């Protein structure tokens, strides 16, 4: 009988200590990493349930193991909610991550050596959009498009490259782009080469679900996403499609299982189902609207303080700060801000002369701070604290004073009550 009589803190004190410290860090730090968010207690509870014990290779009604009648119900719930949330005809909720979702889609639609066209990592793309260190850059012939001098996607370049190289697939989406993607125009360009148009909406899935950011589902052949970030669910992946056919959907399913993965993580799929239900509620839309409001306020504040924002604006949850004229690297900014309990991430900027380990910029996102209740007043203060620290990096007393203010704000707005 599995009845743990010894308290966890006594059974494994080292692990317990690390977890407790991480809990405190999340409560006492202002989280501005654009890819991070806080899940609900429901999501965390489900992930710690008995579902973690169940193996369920295959799909609902077509499993390779017995005893799947209840996990079938759970996966079907997740599928139907995902389809409703994003107005899709097809959903696969099994990918363990966004990268796994992308890998599955690529292998379903492409052959090794095919040409793909994705956004440059240094211009705001993602590793899986063709980076040389990633499977996408190793398996396929990669051509990259980027942003223009104004920090906007260069559609003329995209069209020119499409006509010249005739890619089998064009990848839309980003990890560090603050503009609005013109999915319709990108599909038009893809059609010029009879190419698949795949959109990775991982960063803006929550905004899309709330109707605040354009939904790519009517333009892309296939859409992929993570289920955390702005969607605020568990860490996982998702594949969606609309107006496809059974042949496409079967290819996608087979590419996920058995192509890329074995048994699905049923405890995570259940958590996805809960997250999709939460995202269908009216208050989720209010939350997403506030994310963008906060992001815009921060951009305005940084501009007022003389900081350069790539593209000069934001229409989503994130933006990039170019620190070139501030004589500080992204890495150093990351380090000094962390001493004041403000967490950001160093990030390359378009045409960055520094390595990805150093960078000339930082990326800031507002999904997590908005989740804990911060509004315009709070994020405006945070912007001022950041500029105060970066303008005076050697003033350690200033860092300590701001850290006190950060702790006061975090105490006023706890993540988990």
UniProtKB/Swiss-Prot annotation:
Location in the cell reads:
Cytoplasm
Annotated residues that bind (6S)-5,6,7,8-tetrahydrofolate are located at 121, 125-127, 355-357
Q: Site described as Plays an important role in substrate specificity, positions?
A: 228
Pathway field of the UniProt record reads: One-carbon metabolism; tetrahydrofolate interconversion; Amino-acid biosynthesis; glycine biosynthesis; glycine from L-serine: step 1/1
Give a GO molecular function annotation for the protein: pyridoxal phosphate binding
EC no. given is 2.1.2.1
The Gene Ontology biological process annotation of the record reads: glycine biosynthetic process from serine; tetrahydrofolate interconversion
Reaction(s) catalysed by this chain, per the record, are: (6R)-5,10-methylene-5,6,7,8-tetrahydrofolate + glycine + H2O = (6S)-5,6,7,8-tetrahydrofolate + L-serine
Q: Which is an annotated Pfam family here?
A: SHMT
List modified residues, type N6-(pyridoxal phosphate)lysine: 229
Tell me the subunit arrangement: Homodimer.
Q: Which family does it belong to?
A: Belongs to the SHMT family.
Q: What is this protein called?
A: Serine hydroxymethyltransferase
Q: Which gene encodes it?
A: glyA
């Amino acid at each position: 009988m599995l009845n743990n009589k010894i308290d966890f803190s006594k059974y494994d004190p080292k692990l317990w200590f690390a977890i407790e410290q991480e809990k405190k860090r999340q409560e006492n730090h202002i989280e501005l990493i654009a890819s991070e968010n806080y899940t609900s207690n429901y999501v965390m509870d489900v992930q710690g349930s008995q579902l973690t014990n169940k193996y369920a290779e295959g799909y609902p009604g077509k499993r390779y193991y017995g005893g799947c009648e209840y996990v079938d119900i759970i996966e079907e719930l997740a599928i139907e909610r995902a389809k409703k949330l994003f107005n899709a005809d097809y959903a696969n909720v099994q990918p363990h991550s966004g990268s796994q979702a992308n890998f599955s889609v690529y292998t379903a639609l492409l052959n090794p050596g095919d040409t793909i066209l994705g956004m440059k990592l240094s211009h705001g793309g993602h590793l899986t959009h063709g980076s040389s260190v990633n499977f996408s850059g190793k398996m396929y012939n990669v051509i990259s498009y980027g942003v223009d001098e104004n920090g906007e996607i260069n559609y003329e370049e995209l069209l020119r490259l499409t006509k010249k190289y005739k890619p089998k697939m064009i990848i839309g989406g980003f990890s560090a782009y603050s503009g609005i993607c013109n999915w319709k125009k990108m599909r038009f360009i893809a059609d010029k080469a009879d190419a698949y148009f795949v959109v990775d909406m991982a960063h803006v899935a929550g905004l899309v679900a709330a109707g605040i950011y354009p939904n790519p589902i009517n333009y892309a052949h296939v859409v992929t996403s993570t289920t955390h970030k702005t969607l605020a669910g568990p860490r996982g992946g998702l594949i969606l499609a609309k107006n496809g056919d059974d042949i496409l959907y079967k290819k996608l399913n087979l590419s996920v299982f058995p192509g890329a993965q074995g048994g699905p993580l049923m405890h995570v799929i259940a958590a996805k189902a809960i997250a999709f239900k939460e995202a269908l509620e009216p208050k989720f839309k209010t939350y997403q609207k506030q994310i963008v409001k906060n992001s815009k306020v921060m951009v305005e504040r940084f501009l007022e303080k003389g900081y350069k924002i790539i593209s000069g604006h934001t229409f989503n949850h994130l933006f990039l700060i170019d620190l070139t004229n501030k004589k500080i690297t992204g890495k150093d900014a990351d380090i000094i801000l962390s001493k004041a309990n403000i967490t950001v991430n160093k990030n390359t900027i378009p045409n960055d002369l520094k390595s990805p380990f150093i960078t000339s910029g930082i990326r800031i996102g507002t999904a997590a701070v908005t989740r804990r209740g911060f509004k315009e007043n709070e994020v405006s203060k945070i912007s001022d604290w950041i500029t105060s620290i970066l303008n005076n990096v050697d003033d350690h007393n200033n860092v300590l004073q701001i850290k006190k203010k950060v702790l006061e704000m975090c105490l006023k707005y706890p993540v988990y009550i």
